[in-house]
């Protein structure tokens, strides 16, 4: 465990942009080190007080869908080298699960999510802010493949959700948050040059913290 504050790397971008691929590439490079991934997707608000018909209306691409207060509290605890109990979201019941995941503090924290750069409070806690920028056509294709294969969705339902929810929310909230990024990575996880540059930058920051 380091004596200094952990390094926080924020990785944002639209759904299907390749955030997870970039996150995994960075994590794999430093997996011999003290590193963890904290996903914003785990921090959707608890909706157990709402009837199912109301939960089904949830817009998961809107900033208000996230419990950023809890996410910030947990991130601050990790920065103080304290363990957290990460919540788990049940997409079947559209509310927070009773399950929790204990997370031990690490020297490097990768914070990943579509809207992490939209909240100034989260931005203030990040040492490096990345935005994974990928063409909209490629993002919808990736989302269709994921939702049909992994979540049992129909193609029509995925397209309908993209047109009526995902695209408008991306244009209104996610795309504008790109201006808060320190580095923009085009072509998502396929951009190995950009990922290598990021790995070098992170290694430099880690070395500087060790030598403080």
Curated annotation (Swiss-Prot):
A molecular-function term among this protein's GO annotations: uridine kinase activity
Gene Ontology cellular component terms for the protein in this record: cytoplasm
A Pfam family the protein falls into: PRK
GO process annotations (BP): CTP salvage; UMP salvage
Task: List localization entries.
Answer: Cytoplasm
Q: What is its main location?
A: cytoplasm
Give the reactions, separated by semicolons, that this protein catalyses: uridine + ATP = UMP + ADP + H(+); cytidine + ATP = CMP + ADP + H(+)
Tell me which domain of life the UniProt entry assigns to the organism this sequence originates from.
Bacteria
Enzyme Commission number(s): 2.7.1.48
**Residue sites binding ATP per the record:** 13-20
Give the pathway annotation: Pyrimidine metabolism; CTP biosynthesis via salvage pathway; CTP from cytidine: step 1/3; Pyrimidine metabolism; UMP biosynthesis via salvage pathway; UMP from uridine: step 1/1
Q: Which CDD domains does the record cross-reference, listed alphabetically? A: UMPK
Sorted UniProt keywords: ATP-binding, Cytoplasm, Kinase, Nucleotide-binding, Transferase
| HAMAP family associated with the record | Uridine_kinase
Into which family does the record put it?
A: Belongs to the uridine kinase family.
User: What is the name attached to this protein's record?
Assistant: Uridine kinase
Give the species.
Bacillus cereus (strain ATCC 14579 / DSM 31 / CCUG 7414 / JCM 2152 / NBRC 15305 / NCIMB 9373 / NCTC 2599 / NRRL B-3711)
**Name of the coding gene:** udk
């Amino acid at each position: 465990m380091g004596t200094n504050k952990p390094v926080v790397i924020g990785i944002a971008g639209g759904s299907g942009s390749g955030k997870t691929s970039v996150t995994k590439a960075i994590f794999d490079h430093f997996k011999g080190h003290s590193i963890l991934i904290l996903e914003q997707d785990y921090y959707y608000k608890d909706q157990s007080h709402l009837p199912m018909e109301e939960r089904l209306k949830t817009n998961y691409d809107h900033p208000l869908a996230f419990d950023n207060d809890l996410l910030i509290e947990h991130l601050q605890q990790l920065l103080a080298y304290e363990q957290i109990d990460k919540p788990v979201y049940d997409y079947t019941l559209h509310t927070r699960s009773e399950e929790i995941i204990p997370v031990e503090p690490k020297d490097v924290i990768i914070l990943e999510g579509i809207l992490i750069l939209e909240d100034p409070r989260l931005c203030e806690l990040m040492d490096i802010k990345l935005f994974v920028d990928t063409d909209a056509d490629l993002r919808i294709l990736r989302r269709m493949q994921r939702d049909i294969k992994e979540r049992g969705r129909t193609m029509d339902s995925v397209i309908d959700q993209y047109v009526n929810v995902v695209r408008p929310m991306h244009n209104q909230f996610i795309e504008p948050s790109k201006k808060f990024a320190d580095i923009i990575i085009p072509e998502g996880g396929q951009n190995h040059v950009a990922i290598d540059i990021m790995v070098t930058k992170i290694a430099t920051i880690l070395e500087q913290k060790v030598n403080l």
